[in-house]
Design a protein with these regions (language model features):
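Conserved AdoMet/S-adenosylmethionine-binding subsite of the radical SAM
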Residues: 1-6, 10-135
Length: 136
């Protein structure tokens, strides 16, 4: 399949001891074996911001790793009942500090203020995120 750009996503796998980190890494290696020149982007859960799990994924050398912040801090408990805003930022910060191109997504139109959106964008930038997508 001569793929040039591959985006891999999944649901959160809290049912697995490593949150799926080993599977993410193996998936990247398998794609590289079949398509060595393909750019690979992952969209991963926060893996509880555990450096050991994040480093497992990072070591597989995807080109971009994304983790979506999804919403502003105030709305996180409502929009992402099992997630924590600060844990997402720590996840992104760790990946960025390891030199990985880091991406996050933010939904708008959920009742957030302009100032809250700007604060979230500032928080993402402070965490080292270089790519942000906005959706509705």
């Amino acid at each position: 399949m001569k793929l040039r750009y591959v985006v891999v996503t999944s649901v959160t796998r809290d049912d697995l001891p490593d949150g799926g980190a080993a599977h993410w890494a193996e998936t990247v290696r398998a794609i590289r074996k079949q398509n060595p020149d393909a750019a690979i982007e992952l969209l991963i859960p926060d893996l509880d911001a555990r450096p050991d799990l994040l480093d497992t994924v990072i070591a597989s050398k995807p080109d971009i790793i994304g983790h979506n912040i999804e919403t502003v801090e105030r709305l996180t408990p409502v929009v992402r009942s099992r997630a924590k805003y600060r844990t997402s930022l720590e996840t992104l910060r760790h990946m960025s500090r390891q030199g990985v191109a880091t991406k996050s997504g933010l939904m708008v139109g959920l009742g957030e203020s302009d100032d809250e959106v700007l604060q979230t964008l500032h928080d993402l930038r402070e965490a080292g995120v270089g790519i942000v997508t906005l959706g509705q």
